[in-house]
């Protein structure tokens, strides 16, 4: 990878980190460690840790980007003695668009698993809702 591309990628990572921070979320860039990379950014949103792999490239190779994100999330967990890796996402820069309009990519099955995990975590000990938009289970 050329120096120009490294600078471009590094700037995108920094922009993503700053955007997350501007919304009040913890976000840090992670150090590069070759085959032991742990992702580009770790962020904590609503108490959940996420690993972000940021890509600022003209040519998209989503399967390769996703494989890298999963591997690096596993490296992150392993380095901290965690059994389960945090959810990983690929953040892809959109041409001629703001950082807020970057694409966030994850396979559908992973996304569903994350949604179900978050719902289960957020409904333990709280009022649960039925499928009727905002109506509490057991009556209105």
Across the structure, where does each feature detected by a protein language model lie?
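Catalytic phosphate/metal-binding cores of nucleic-acid and nucleotide-processing enzymes, i.e., regions
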Residues: 1-140
